[in-house]
Amino acid sequence: MAYTHRQLFQKFMAPTSDAPLALEITRAEGVYLYDSAGKSYIDLISGIAVSNVGHRNPSVVKAIKDQVDAYMHLMVYGEYIQSPQVKLAEALVKSTGTTHLNQVYFTNSGTEAVEGAMKLAKRFTGKTEFISCFNAYHGASQGALSIAGDENFKNAFRPLLPDIRHIHHGCIANLSKITKRTAAVIIEIVAGEAGIKTASPSYFQALRKRCTETGSLLIIDE
């Protein structure tokens, strides 16, 4: 028996929500998705911002094809010198406009980046307390989920990591919760899950100052 793609989706794909959209997308171009019936949809998700320059962007497609013609996956952990990787690392370092953020460790996802940053913070400071914001979301792995600021994400997976505290995004008065026990504060410049909230430059300046005073690292998630 030959299954349709929809049947394969329902039979073999582990569900991630109670009511998936289940659109069968056959192609994408620019801001549009096209289903198996040819109907077009404006893509307001964009792969959660992965496709932020549009689907099948000609410059991106060319870069991918050029790289495939040279080589694809070689090795992780920085063992080999790979031209695209080292050029991107240089560009990222230069984009920070600082002298102390001078090296890059690449990961496959934002969640992995958060996990790596938490491990580094614990190792560097010797402390275990982390502070994040209420309603924040930093990923679904064990460590990243522990610092989530919404209990709805966490209650099915407890016990999680201990020594987690929360502050309100943009509230300078809350910064007193950062103490010498704090390994790191992790925060989004734009709090996406909390409703696309931003904070003033003075808030982030005060946050940076407080972390310096307490010997806590400051982790910026995207």
Give the predicted meaning of each segment:
Residues 90-187, 191-193, 205:
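PLP-dependent aspartate aminotransferase-fold enzymes
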Residues 1-29, 84-85:
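Active-site-adjacent loop/helix segments that line or gate small-molecule/cofactor pockets in enzymes
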Residues 51-52, 81, 173-174, 192-197:
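Short, small-residue-enriched loops and turns at beta-alpha junctions
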Residues 22-44:
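Active-site and channel-lining beta-strand-loop segments
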Residues 40-127, 131:
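Glycine-rich loop-to-alpha-helix module at the N-terminal edge of alpha/beta enzyme cores
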Residues 39, 184, 217-218:
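Hydrophobic "anchor" residues on beta-strands that sit immediately upstream
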Residues 197-222:
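Catalytic PLP-binding core of fold-type I/II PLP enzymes
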Residues 42, 187, 220-222:
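Active-site flanking residues adjacent to catalytic metal/cofactor-binding acidic residues
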